[in-house]
């Protein structure tokens, strides 16, 4: 943030500091709010870990997934804002009398975090497995090979007993935002989190009812649910963190503003994810990949310019 703040005030194009141009302004607003969200996530997850009474496997996975992806994207945008200077080494910049900020090196160092200690793809699968665990516990017996008809009937009756109590609660609206006891803006976002959580659970249940045991193979579909769940956790963490900073005087207003902005942007992304769950191009994607793996597009490889 400091690198961008100093540079976008110093660098002038078309008569204005580049930070005043809307294209850069959009990037910097995201950098600021995402940095706050990253800070919130690791602090919330760390606090839960220190408590020793929480099973934080899911929260830790979400924190790893979000923070590594967000950090890499932040550096990508910083590189873009710095322009050609972003590719220079620190020594090269200092030799020209400028501050030695090696953004491209930071970007390369950050990139490895998307692959080690659980790649982003593995994190998606782990989070999905945790999210589906409730359903797998209750419907798994229906699809186990070798289970007798009587066993499946018993499993079905047990499943119906559980879902008859659980499913109706997903349709109960969240009426009051004040119950969260935060700033009004944060309360509204927490109400949104509660409302969308119910919608996500309903939608996931409906998709599982449609795809049944094949649901585990629908990774493109599942990943959208993972992204929604991740966004909801980050929104909750951002609101909680902003609320905890109330005692810090002037930082409190800034914290609420940052959390408010992040949550508004996250809500827009969530709406798009729900839309993609309902209508997507997954079948064509898988078909095209199959043709790719069969070598049907080798002619594109032959058209590459050779030195």
Feature locations, PLM:
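Flavin-dependent oxidoreductase catalytic core characteristic
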Residues: 1-307
């Amino acid at each position: 943030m400091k690198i961008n703040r100093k540079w976008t005030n110093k660098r002038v194009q078309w008569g204005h500091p580049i930070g005043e141009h809307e294209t850069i302004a959009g990037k910097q607003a995201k950098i600021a709010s995402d940095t706050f969200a990253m800070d919130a996530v690791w602090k919330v997850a760390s606090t839960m870990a220190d408590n020793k009474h929480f099973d934080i496997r899911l929260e830790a996975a979400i924190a790893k997934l979000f923070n590594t992806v967000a950090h890499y994207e932040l550096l990508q945008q910083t590189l873009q804002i710095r322009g050609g200077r972003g590719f220079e080494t620190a020594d090269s910049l200092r030799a020209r009398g400028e501050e030695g900020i090696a953004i491209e090196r930071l970007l390369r160092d950050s990139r490895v975090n998307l692959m080690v200690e659980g790649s982003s793809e593995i994190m998606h699968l782990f989070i999905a497995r945790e999210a589906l665990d409730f359903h797998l516990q209750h419907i798994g017996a229906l699809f186990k090979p070798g289970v007798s008809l009587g066993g499946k009937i018993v499993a079905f009756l047990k499943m119906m007993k559980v879902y008859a109590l659980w499913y109706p609660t997903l349709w109960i609206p969240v009426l009051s935002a004040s119950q969260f006891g935060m700033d009004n803006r944060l309360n509204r976002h927490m109400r949104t989190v509660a409302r969308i959580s119910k919608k996500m659970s309903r939608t996931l249940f409906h998709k599982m009812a449609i795809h049944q045991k094949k649901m585990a193979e629908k990774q493109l579909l599942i990943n959208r649910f993972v992204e929604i769940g991740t966004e909801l956790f980050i929104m909750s963490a951002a609101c909680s963190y902003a609320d905890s900073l109330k005692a810090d005087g002037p930082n409190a207003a800034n914290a609420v503003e940052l959390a408010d902005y992040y949550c508004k942007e996250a809500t827009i992304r969530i709406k798009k994810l729900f839309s993609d769950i309902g209508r997507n191009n997954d079948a064509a994607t898988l078909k095209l990949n199959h043709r790719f793996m069969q070598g049907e597009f080798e002619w594109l490889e032959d058209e590459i310019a050779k030195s």
